[in-house]
């Protein structure tokens, strides 16, 4: 079989495949033979239909199309194997099938044009002496006090309040019912329209302004037990439930009980109750170490991300569609698994309407992921960065000890995953050693909100769908 190769854009190899007259004839005859043995034509037993009758009944075009399908499939498969092309994904036919049928004559040569995706070539214009900035995350001593105070609040004892009205920090037990406030000029005698889900009995709420929509908590402050009050509140705009965004509301609230928190002292006894440490000093030292490590880890991650972002500016690679689609598939699968573990119904979230949108929104990140992976692999090859079996074994052992409940583990696959992770880590460390990074204060390069938003586009889409498909609840109405 004569095969001519041609380099195409998007990391494709074009193939011009010339199929010999013998094969075009042989395939055609075999198709007729197969059809003759299976065709059900009145007046003839199967396998005994005369050739002219078979051709007349089935039609030459249908028979040629069946033979052509076999020629195309076998021809491309043999060409890829003959030329030892490391193809990825499914080959694509570049010739028009209609033109091939018109040109196909059994016993004469047939030329087929096809294309296959292959691993892309990575051109690293520069990968050493890179210059970039990264945000340095510093340990904040206040984190320790905040952590201890949070634990202290969790251990609070609720004591009934007597002789005073509600104030910020109290725990109130209320009945409430919410309605839409009347618009200006609306009939004062008309009944208020209830807000769906904005009704509760014996609802316990901590009087903290940031936990509910503006006006609700401040309206309760100053109330006495058994008192009923009409409270005006305003839904913020934007708001999770778009139907309520920016709308004014009226709540009829009855304060049934009022309690205050009695907080424990932060001492050695407190430390023993919330941890395995004997003294408060030991607990504080442990928290300092933990938050210091978290800060160092975040700084390290920032340096790695900044490095990879800078590296991609100096990489030239033409990605095949197959790799991009495979990465998009993997990303959506990971998102679905994560949402399923959170108890969400993935079938309701990943509808036929939203999947194409998610695929399109995931494409940019998928392309960046692939470029990163290919670039790091190329650096590893050029610099002969390797991982030893001993290093793999140590990491595998750590993982197995970390998850002892996992009984059915494919250790070969686990070792392969670990090898890739270690190789990536080593390559990034090598690049950092051969680059220059300037550490700048946290928050000085880009707002954290933008970073978090960029990382959760897909989750945001499916979460919005979940909101649209669910009934409103008390917390949806009242929480800000």
Swiss-Prot record:
Taxonomy of the source species? Bacteria, Bacillati, Cyanobacteriota, Cyanophyceae, Nostocales
Purpose:
Involved in protein export. Acts as a chaperone by maintaining the newly synthesized protein in an open conformation. Functions as a peptidyl-prolyl cis-trans isomerase.
Q: What is its EC number?
A: 5.2.1.8
Q: Which residues form the PPIase FKBP-type domain?
A: 169-264
- Report a single Gene Ontology molecular function: protein folding chaperone
Gene from which the chain derives: tig
Which InterPro entries does its entry note?
Answer: PPIase_dom_sf, PPIase_FKBP_dom, Trig_fac, Trigger_fac_C, Trigger_fac_C_sf, Trigger_fac_ribosome-bd_bac, Trigger_fac_ribosome-bd_sf, Trigger_fact/SurA_dom_sf
Which GO BP terms apply?
Answer: 'de novo' cotranslational protein folding; cell division; chaperone-mediated protein folding; protein transport; protein unfolding
Q: What is known of its domains?
A: Consists of 3 domains; the N-terminus binds the ribosome, the middle domain has PPIase activity, while the C-terminus has intrinsic chaperone activity on its own.
- The protein depicted here goes by the name Trigger factor
Where do Polar residues bias regions lie?
462-480
């Amino acid at each position: 079989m004569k095969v001519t190769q041609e380099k195409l854009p998007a990391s494709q190899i074009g193939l011009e495949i010339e199929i010999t007259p013998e094969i075009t004839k042989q395939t055609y005859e075999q198709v007729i033979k197969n059809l003759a043995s299976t065709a059900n034509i009145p007046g003839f037993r199967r396998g005994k239909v005369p050739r002219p009758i078979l051709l007349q009944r089935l039609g030459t075009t249908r028979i040629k199309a069946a033979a052509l399908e076999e020629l195309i499939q076998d021809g491309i498969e043999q060409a890829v194997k003959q030329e030892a092309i490391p193809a990825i994904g499914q080959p694509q036919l570049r010739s028009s099938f209609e033109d091939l049928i018109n040109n196909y004559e059994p016993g004469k040569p047939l030329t087929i044009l096809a294309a296959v995706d292959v691993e892309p070539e990575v051109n690293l214009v520069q990968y050493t002496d890179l210059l970039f900035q990264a945000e340095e995350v510093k340990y904040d001593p206040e984190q320790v006090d905040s952590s201890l105070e949070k634990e202290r609040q969790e251990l609070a004892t609720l004591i009934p309040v007597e002789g005073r009205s509600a104030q910020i920090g109290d725990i109130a037990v209320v009945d409430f019912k919410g309605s839409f406030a009347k618009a200006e000029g609306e009939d004062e005698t008309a009944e208020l329209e209830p807000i769906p889900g904005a009704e509760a009995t014996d609802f316990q709420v901590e009087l903290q302004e940031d936990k509910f929509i503006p006006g609700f908590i401040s309206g309760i402050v100053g109330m006495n037990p058994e008192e009923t009050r009409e409270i005006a509140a305003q839904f913020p705009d934007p708001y999770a439930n778009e139907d309520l965004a920016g709308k004014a509301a009226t709540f009829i609230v009855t304060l049934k009980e009022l309690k205050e928190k009695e907080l424990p002292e932060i001492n050695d006894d407190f430390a023993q109750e919330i941890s395995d440490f004997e003294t408060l000093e030991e607990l504080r030292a442990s928290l300092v170490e933990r938050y210091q490590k978290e800060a160092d880890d975040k700084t390290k991650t920032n340096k790695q991300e900044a490095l990879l972002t800078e590296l991609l500016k100096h990489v030239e690679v033409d990605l095949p569609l197959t790799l991009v689609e495979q990465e998009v598939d993997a990303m959506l699968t990971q998102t679905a698994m994560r949402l399923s573990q959170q108890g969400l119904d993935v079938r309701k979230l990943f509808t036929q309407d939203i999947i194409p949108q998610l695929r399109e929104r995931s494409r940019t990140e998928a392309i960046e992921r692939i470029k990163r992976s290919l670039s790091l692999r190329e650096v590893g090859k050029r610099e002969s960065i390797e991982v030893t079996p001993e290093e793999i074994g140590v990491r595998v052992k750590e993982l197995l000890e970390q998850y002892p409940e996992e009984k059915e583990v494919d250790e070969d696959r686990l070792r392969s995953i670990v090898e890739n992770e270690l190789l990536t880590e080593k390559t990034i460390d090598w690049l950092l050693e051969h680059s220059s990074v300037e550490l700048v204060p946290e928050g000085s390069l880009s707002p954290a909100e933008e970073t978090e938003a960029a990382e959760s586009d897909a989750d945001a889409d499916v979460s919005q769908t979940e909101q649209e498909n669910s009934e409103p609840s008390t917390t949806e109405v009242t929480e800000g």
